[in-house]
Regions:
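Conserved phosphate-binding elements of NTP-dependent enzyme cores
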Residues: 1-261
Length: 261
């Protein structure tokens, strides 16, 4: 951990120097900041990175900038939910597939808002705003798709469940449950599955990124260094303890974590 009072250049050291230098050395790629003319912070020597296969920045940047992005799509759990609905007898009878329940492709989505559930309204002197789509009333889908129900709930009602509720609602879905459990473990069990990414705070977005990394870390090959900037922002003491245990789940297999606080 890199600790220090506010203004002591913790973020500069961890992000602008360490992360960007490792990114350049390991992948040979340059961050967007470098493309915009900002250089890697000055340092004398960088050693010990030879055994690393990747460096991952887990920051507080939004997971998406439109209502189309949400927690369940970000952690790649929506594929499982769509598969479950496509297997419902009524869906099979109507020849619906998993893509029918996607709001990112044509089929079952509302075409007026293109599955976003919201319409963007351009404002001249202020930031653009999003208002619920009048065609689908914010549901994202065409009415016939909502006829398909799994244990009494349609796809919209499932997306309105919190992570905690969804874990109880899908007790036999191991793959889906594992992804949702990781979100719960980072203290985000209160988030709704389909909650627009635009409503998430920076701290929530960062912890969601941690949850996704935890979900896929067991499948990944090689050693990673995770760089995090103040992940305990606005967390209560008990939540910090939980987060520390969760980060241990990343370190235990073969990865390392560097964080600033």
């Amino acid at each position: 951990a890199v600790t220090g009072v506010s203004g002591s250049c913790k973020s500069t050291l961890v992000h602008d120097i360490l992360f960007r230098a490792l990114e350049q050395r390991i992948t040979g790629e340059h961050s967007a900041k470098q493309h915009l003319g900002e250089r890697v912070g000055a340092f004398d020597e960088l050693t010990g990175y030879e055994s690393l296969d990747a460096v991952v920045l887990v920051d507080q940047e939004p997971i998406g900038r439109t209502p189309r992005s949400n927690p369940v799509t970000y952690i790649k759990a929506f594929d499982e939910i769509r598969r479950i609905f496509a297997d419902v007898p009524l869906a099979r009878e109507r020849k619906y597939t998993a893509s029918t329940f996607s709001f990112n492709v044509k089929g079952g989505r509302c075409e007026k808002c293109e599955g976003a559930g919201y319409i963007e309204v351009e404002m001249v002197f202020m930031a653009d705003v999003y208002v619920p789509c009048e065609e689908c009333d914010g549901t994202r889908y065409k009415p016939p798709v909502l006829d398909v129900k799994y244990h009494g709930r349609n796809i919209v009602e499932v997306l309105d469940l919190t992570v905690d509720q969804a874990i109880r609602f899908f007790p036999k879905e191991e793959k889906l449950g594992q992804a949702l459990w990781q979100v719960q473990q980072v203290g985000l069990g209160y988030l709704r599955l389909g909650q627009p990414a635009t409503t998430l705070s920076g701290g929530e977005a960062q912890r969601l990124k941690i949850a996704r990394e935890l979900t896929f870390s067991a499948k990944s090959v090689g050693k990673k260094l995770y760089v995090m900037d103040e992940p305990t922002t606005v967390l209560q003491l008990e939540d910090i303890r939980t987060l520390a245990q969760v980060l241990g789940g990343l370190v235990d297999p073969r990865h390392s974590v560097v964080l600033s606080e």
